[in-house]
């Protein structure tokens, strides 16, 4: 019989163990580039799915790397996972990739973990604190498709925009004060933001759509057009400008 793990502990263990696995296969050096990324996606997905099947067999499951099962829509508890957020960054040796683990209950992330393995840290909703103090005067954006609205907001605030890889990495760098806001308007899916939002909201950051509406998860359509994560004192100004 396996030991019972509470939700917070299971969330942490999933993120940390997946980080260890992904760093392990990359450090072997037998694969590189796309082959390494594909292997990382598969390994992380299979590991997380098997652990959840054993420890939370009655919960729903939504992952970027698995076929969607509509049965999740009838469940109050759903795990929303991105096993490897930033596959390209991982495969090319960059540090801005992440692991997203979120338990969503009735549409809201209640337990979340975002692992940044190359930085040796897992951020947890159960122990999250946002940095306060002087502004960094920087807004983090996608390095693939930085939205025009982010540049507009940055100009109005006297800030600059700066690109970074995975959504989890961007959100966590707002949390630790390297940036003041993360603005994305190019479209994402629920697994891109459920865990980062769970951690950032627990830490006291503002998290919403760009129209100010609440971010809700476990929808039939998992597409999410835009997102804002920022220091709470900047939220009203950014939402008005956006």
Show which residues each predicted segment covers:
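Generic detector of well-ordered alpha-helical packing
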Residues: 42, 65, 83-86, 117, ...
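Flexible hinge/capping segments at coil-to-helix
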Residues: 127-137
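An extended, acidic
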Residues: 135-242
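Residue-level signal for inorganic ion chemistry
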Residues: 18, 22, 52, 61, ...
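DPxDG-like acidic metal-binding loop motif
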Residues: 72-127
């Amino acid at each position: 019989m396996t030991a019972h793990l509470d939700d917070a502990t299971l969330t942490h263990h999933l993120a940390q163990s997946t980080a260890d696995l992904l760093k392990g296969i990359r450090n072997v050096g037998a694969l590189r580039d796309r082959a390494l990324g594909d292997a990382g996606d598969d390994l992380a997905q299979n590991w997380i799915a098997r652990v959840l099947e054993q420890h939370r067999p009655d919960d729903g499951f939504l992952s970027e790397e698995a076929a969607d099962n509509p049965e999740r829509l009838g469940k109050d508890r759903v795990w929303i996972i991105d096993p490897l957020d930033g596959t390209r960054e991982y495969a090319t040796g960059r540090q801005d990739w992440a692991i997203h683990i979120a338990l969503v209950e009735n549409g809201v992330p209640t337990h979340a973990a975002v692992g940044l393995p190359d930085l040796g840290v897992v951020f947890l909703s159960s122990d999250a604190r946002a940095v306060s103090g002087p502004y960094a005067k920087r807004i983090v954006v996608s390095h693939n498709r930085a939205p025009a609205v982010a540049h507009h907001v940055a100009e109005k605030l006297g800030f600059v925009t700066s690109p970074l890889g995975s959504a989890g990495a961007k959100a966590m760098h707002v949390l630790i004060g390297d940036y003041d806001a993360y603005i994305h308007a190019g479209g994402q899916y629920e697994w891109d933001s459920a865990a980062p939002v769970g951690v950032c909201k627990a830490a006291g950051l503002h998290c919403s759509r760009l129209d100010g509406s609440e971010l809700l998860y476990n929808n039939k359509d998992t597409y999410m057009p835009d997102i804002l994560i920022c220091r709470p004192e900047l939220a009203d100004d950014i939402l008005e400008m956006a």
